Curated annotation (Swiss-Prot):
The protein's assembly and partners: Binds ribosomal protein uS19.
Matching Pfam families: PRC_RimM, RimM
Domain observations: The PRC barrel domain binds ribosomal protein uS19.
GO cellular component assignments: cytoplasm; ribosome
Molecular function via GO: ribosome binding
Name listed for the protein in its UniProt record: Ribosome maturation factor RimM
Main location: cytoplasm
InterPro entries: PRC_barrel-like_sf, PRC_RimM, RimM, RimM_N, RimM_N_sf, Transl_B-barrel_sf
Residue ranges occupied by any PRC barrel domain in the UniProt entry: 113-189
Encoding gene per record: rimM
ATP-binding keyword on record: no
Keywords: Chaperone, Cytoplasm, Ribosome biogenesis, rRNA processing
């Protein structure tokens, strides 16, 4: 029989980013497996607290947003495992199954020069070298060797989509404070 740990009710920070879900209990000492949404889930390792929300569907052990203190998170095989000082056994870990994990963006580690978190690129305006607006970053796709920007733009009153490889050959500059990406790209490509 699973039982919910005592977790403090909280408010989701304005800069919260959903980074994964609690997949299942792991072992008998309260560890749990995390299904991370990123292949490089550094934010899960650096944040000392996670904000949890119940799954959208299925059984819910809690409502609203709760704060989960994190004692340790690490890679194990092909997944992430973590433990909390308030989750002491398998039954308690099982009660968290399906919970959505959020981390404050301010708790993410600083990216290296020339590297960006996808969440920081969403909503940026993309212009070409001539200053022509190509669209707004709506999504990003990982195609294996490279990432592709998915832009939304309007043409003839219709919503359209444009894709630009997010590689140095096409992206000249990313200006996060200015909320702009400059690309070597033409509207008719």
């Amino acid at each position: 029989m699973s039982h919910m740990p005592e977790l403090e009710a909280s408010v989701l920070p304005a800069d919260a980013v959903e980074v994964g879900r609690i997949a299942d209990a792991w072992g008998i000492k309260g560890w749990f497996k995390v299904a991370a949404f990123s292949a490089d889930p550094e934010a899960l390792f650096t944040a000392k607290q996670w904000y949890l929300q119940p799954p959208e569907k299925g059984a819910r052990q809690f409502t609203g947003t709760v704060l989960l203190p994190v004692k340790q998170a690490r890679v194990h095989s092909d997944s992430v495992v973590a433990t909390s000082p308030v989750v002491n056994d398998r039954n308690t870990a099982e009660a968290l199954r399906g919970a959505r994990i959020f981390v404050a963006r301010s708790d993410f580690p600083q990216p290296e020069d020339g590297e960006y978190y996808w969440v920081d690129l969403l909503g940026l305006s993309v212009v070409n070298r001539e200053g022509v607006v190509l669209g707004v970053v709506r999504d990003l796709l990982s195609t294996g060797p490279q990432t592709v920007l998915v832009l939304a733009y309007e043409e003839d009153g219709k919503e359209r989509e444009r894709m630009i490889p997010f590689v140095d050959a096409y992206v000249d500059k990313v200006d996060l404070p200015g909320k702009t990406i400059v690309a070597d790209w033409q509207p008719d490509y």
